From Swiss-Prot:
Source organism: Oryza sativa subsp. indica
GO terms, molecular function: magnesium ion transmembrane transporter activity
Subcellular location: Membrane
UniProt KW Magnesium keyword: yes
Keyword Ion transport: yes
Alphabetized InterPro entries for the sequence: CorA_TM1_TM2, MgTranspt_CorA/ZnTranspt_ZntB, MRS2-like
Name of the protein described by the UniProt record: Magnesium transporter MRS2-I
Membrane protein topology class: Multi-pass membrane protein
GO cellular component, as recorded: membrane
Length: 381
């Protein structure tokens, strides 16, 4: 493995800029087909000149700008913007932006391992399958595997934190648990959008054979070198899968494979389908988690409705008791008026009867109200 060498930005690419301000230099790491790696401290003009892309495509890779996940096929390069992985892949080299970023370092290590030249003692049979794959597909596979693994790991972390929090919330509804679940739900929504975008990008590529054909850089390079193609053309694309994926469309499985045919995208299709299934599985996990959160919310709402109904029942009992006591107080108020009447003369026993009858009547009235409410199903039994 060659040691990393710092290479100055290519000044010739910006020679025609005149007095214009040069773009800010950015750190890139370059891996070529021979397994050599270099660190490039190049500005955008140097990168555009090196890989033959326009400024709009390069702007997609700017970490300061918010662009969705994108895989673009150009004449001489594949432009990749997958979350933190921002790369440009050509038929002979791959450039990865910000190689010192914590999330990018594992991608650099994997590229260093997968793109390293084969050892002299290695059997040809062991490396035949990998050697037959074009360089751009090996680099593309590393980036897809990295982003799928990254999003899958984030999903697993979210699941390990969300399910216990949701179970705790169902057992005890508190402000702390509600706030915890709210934060987890917000994180799940953001992660779901990121996974969905990567999945949609892969699905869009799989649905368009022309877009997949644009990613065959080695084939286009060989076609440019040999305009006349025939049966003796370069065999870049074997029919056997290179990534262990056995998924293929029935229409292509039944048709004979013509190597070098510009419409033959079976190898790339198998590559993309494998990681499409992986990212789709991650999205299914997030969908299951979202459904679990929705079920938990429904359960909590049912509990809250039950508590609300209990409070309404209590309010009904208290209101009924208040009405009965008000009638009892009305009787006391009537007899407390300073109006002459004969009951006050030698009829002391009447006081006992008035108090007793009024109390029994109010109690009977309260019981009747409660019984009527139970009969109509307004309160629980």
């Amino acid at each position: 493995m060659a040691a990393a060498v710092v290479v100055a930005g290519e000044a010739a690419a910006a020679a025609g800029a005149g007095g214009k301000k040069r773009g800010a230099s950015r750190s890139w790491i370059l891996f070529d087909a021979a397994g050599e790696e270099r660190v490039l401290d190049a500005d955008k003009y140097a990168i555009m000149h090196r890989v033959d892309i326009n400024a709009r495509d390069l702007r997609i890779l700017d970490p300061l700008l918010s662009y969705p996940s994108t895989i673009l096929g150009r004449e001489r390069a594949i432009v990749l913007n997958l979350e933190h992985i921002k790369a440009i892949i050509t038929a002979e080299e791959v450039l990865l932006r910000d190689p010192l970023d914590d999330n990018v370092i594992p991608v650099v290590e994997e590229l260093r391992r997968r793109l390293a030249p084969s050892s002299a003692t290695q059997h040809d049979v062991e490396g035949a399958e990998e050697d037959e794959s074009p360089f751009e597909f090996r680099a593309l596979e590393v980036t897809l595997e990295a982003i799928c693994s990254f999003l899958g790991a984030r999903t697993t972390e979210l699941e390990s934190a969300a399910y216990p929090a949701l179970d705790e919330l169902t057992s005890k509804i508190s402000s702390r648990n509600l706030d915890r679940v709210r934060k987890l739900k917000s994180g799940m929504t953001r992660l779901n959008a990121r996974v969905q975008k990567v999945r949609d990008e892969l699905e869009q590529l799989l649905d368009d054979d022309d877009d997949m054909a644009d990613l065959y850089l080695s084939r286009k390079l060989a076609g440019a070198a040999s305009p006349v193609s025939g049966s003796g053309g370069p065999n870049w694309f074997p029919a056997s899968p290179t990534i262990g994926s056995k998924i293929s469309r029935a229409s292509r499985a039944s048709a004979p494979t013509i190597h070098g045919n510009e419409n033959d995208v079976e190898e790339l299709e198998m590559l993309l389908e494998a990681y499409f299934m992986q990212i789709d599985g991650t999205l299914n996990k997030l969908t299951t988690l979202r459904e679990y959160i929705d079920d938990t919310e429904d359960y909590i709402n049912i509990q809250l409705d039950n508590h609300r109904n209990q409070l309404i029942q209590l309010e009904l009992f208290l209101s009924s008791g208040t009405v009965c006591l008000s009638l009892y107080s009305l009787v006391a108020g009537i007899f407390g008026m300073n109006i002459p009447y004969t009951w006050n003369d030698n009829h002391g026993y009447v006081f006992k009867w008035v108090v007793l009858v009024s109390g029994l009547f109010c109690a009977f009235m309260f019981v009747s109200i409660v019984a009527y409410a139970r009969h109509k199903g307004l309160v629980g039994s």
